Amino acid sequence: MEVKPLKKLKLYGFNNLTKTLSFNMYDICYAKTPEHRDAYIQYIDEEYNAQRLTSIVTEVARIVGANILNIAKQDYDPQGASVTMLIAEEHLGPENPDDNPFDPVYTDKEGPLPDAVVAHLDKSHITVHTYPESHPHGGISTFRADIDVSTCGQISPLKALNFLIESFAPDIIVADYRVRGFTRDVDGKKVFIDHKINSIQNYVDRKYRDLYQMIDVTVFQEYIFHTKMILKDFDLDNYLFGTAKKELSINDKRKIKQRLKKEMAEIFYGKNMPRM
């Protein structure tokens, strides 16, 4: 969905508003044996390695209309990965198009960085970190990815929301969006938000709204928007790793379903739950 600016809003100078989208997604599965758990962690570690995450955040930068200044990526031992991308609203490449802006010969030149780069160094960035996790009791394994998209200027991270949902297809999503700082109009009046929003749900495509149950917590006067999403439908086959549903007894299916639903409820509501 398009991010609609406020009508007749003419700004003076640079747009100093900082807009941040925090997108936390969870994937949950049941891995019966230690071998299955290890295989799940290895699968996640390969599926969402630093290279794959880099391609995702690169597409996020393209969607929001940002230019990439620098990328740092890392795979961790025994598992997990992270990518940090520095972005800017305007193109900040070298005057000579044949020069590589990421070449140390170019970036390490003496003298001050361009003003636009300095303005963006600690404001406009995309980061992603992954957290595979399992516990020997109960057979539940989880995977969490945290993506933060922070922009300074006119570009909005909300444009990338649906792409992130599509890329990870998570069981649970916890999304936070906030706007900080202020800019001024041509008359000097402060502007604390420059686009229309009353819920993150405004920017979620209908096809995803139909798939997820969603709840909101909004503190509009503080420009804080919080939305939680959990899949409506539950198919046990989608949560089994290394085991087929047909291999389980009716009693085992019931117990595993209860464990998975309890795990998902605890993650969704952010607290430990009684037996379900």
UniProtKB/Swiss-Prot annotation:
Which EC number applies? Answer: 4.1.1.50
Cofactor binding note: Binds 1 pyruvoyl group covalently per subunit.
One Gene Ontology cellular component:
cytosol
Which residues are listed under the site Cleavage (non-hydrolytic)?
A: 123-124
> In this chain, where does the modification Pyruvic acid (Ser) occur?
124
Q: According to its UniProt record, which residues of this chain constitute the active site?
A: 124, 129, 152
* Enzymatic class: lyase
- What are the protein's GO molecular function terms? adenosylmethionine decarboxylase activity
Keywords assigned by UniProt?
A: Autocatalytic cleavage, Decarboxylase, Lyase, Polyamine biosynthesis, Pyruvate, S-adenosyl-L-methionine, Schiff base, Spermidine biosynthesis, Zymogen
The catalysed reaction is: S-adenosyl-L-methionine + H(+) = S-adenosyl 3-(methylsulfanyl)propylamine + CO2
**Pathway of action:** Amine and polyamine biosynthesis; S-adenosylmethioninamine biosynthesis; S-adenosylmethioninamine from S-adenosyl-L-methionine: step 1/1
InterPro entries xref list: AdoMetDC_fam_prok (IPR003826), S-AdoMet_deCO2ase_bac (IPR009165), S-AdoMet_deCO2ase_core (IPR016067)
Disulfide partners: none
Modification note: Is synthesized initially as an inactive proenzyme. Formation of the active enzyme involves a self-maturation process in which the active site pyruvoyl group is generated from an internal serine residue via an autocatalytic post-translational modification. Two non-identical subunits are generated from the proenzyme in this reaction, and the pyruvate is formed at the N-terminus of the alpha chain, which is derived from the carboxyl end of the proenzyme.
Names of the cofactor(s): pyruvate
One GO BP annotation of this record:
spermidine biosynthetic process
* PANTHER family in the record: S-ADENOSYLMETHIONINE DECARBOXYLASE PROENZYME
Q: Which family does it belong to?
A: Belongs to the prokaryotic AdoMetDC family. Type 2 subfamily.
Q: Indicate the quaternary assembly.
A: Heterooctamer of four alpha and four beta chains arranged as a tetramer of alpha/beta heterodimers.
Q: What does this protein do?
A: Catalyzes the decarboxylation of S-adenosylmethionine to S-adenosylmethioninamine (dcAdoMet), the propylamine donor required for the synthesis of the polyamines spermine and spermidine from the diamine putrescine.
| Name of the protein described by the UniProt record | S-adenosylmethionine decarboxylase proenzyme
Q: What high-level taxonomic lineage is stated for the organism?
A: Bacteria, Bacillati, Bacillota, Clostridia, Eubacteriales
Gene that this polypeptide is encoded by: speD
